[in-house]
Amino acid sequence: DSTHGFCGAALSTNVIHFWKSDVGKWEWEKVIDVENEPHPDWPIPVPGVMSAILVSMDDKYLYLNNWLHGDMRQYDITDPHNPKLTGQIWMGGLLGRAPEVNGIKVAGGPQMFQLSLDGKRLYVTTSLFSTWDNQFYPEIRTQGGVMVMIDCDVENGGMNINENFIVDFGKEPNGPSRCHETRYPGGDCTSDIWL
């Protein structure tokens, strides 16, 4: 019954919160702003390129990616006007903060992601569009993409990469392959197959 919602702006790397006011007027505000980061090989600071956002089934957490920076973030949105950063992990990306995950070199950055219905498992893949992949992460052509699982703390907030799970699509038959969207048998947070 809530009128609150969120949308992500990819290139400016912002999250916009919108809601219907008590007088029935739609309002909006920018509630998350990811700063561009300097890079020695770029003439301008690198934007995060937030290609997706996701809200947990209990409306407690919002997840977002920064494909070029290389991080996934978790925000507590209990107060939708003031999201609080509660978790952040690094995997791949242009900033070089996590070039390897679980012993595998990551080509690309966190891109598509899917959350389990209980909110405890977030699966993240690294390919956006092949032309963009090839431009920003040319090594993905020969290495392929990966999928990692992030364990999410649904009580206190926080995220950790699961050290016992990684799918290396570079080793797939007829590969290397790229990975994009993930779906769960039985349902996930952005499909209605579980209804």
Please report, for each region that a protein language model flagged, where it lies by residue:
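Beta-propeller domains
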Residues: 1-80
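Short, conserved, GDST-rich strand-edge loop motifs in beta-rich repeat architectures
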Residues: 7-8, 18, 125-144
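Short loop/turn segments immediately following beta-strands, especially the blade-tip
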Residues: 17-30, 74-86, 137-139, 149-162
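Surface-exposed loop and turn segments in beta-propeller and other repeat-based domains
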Residues: 25-46, 86-105, 162-195
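Repeat-solenoid scaffold signature
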Residues: 62, 66, 109-137
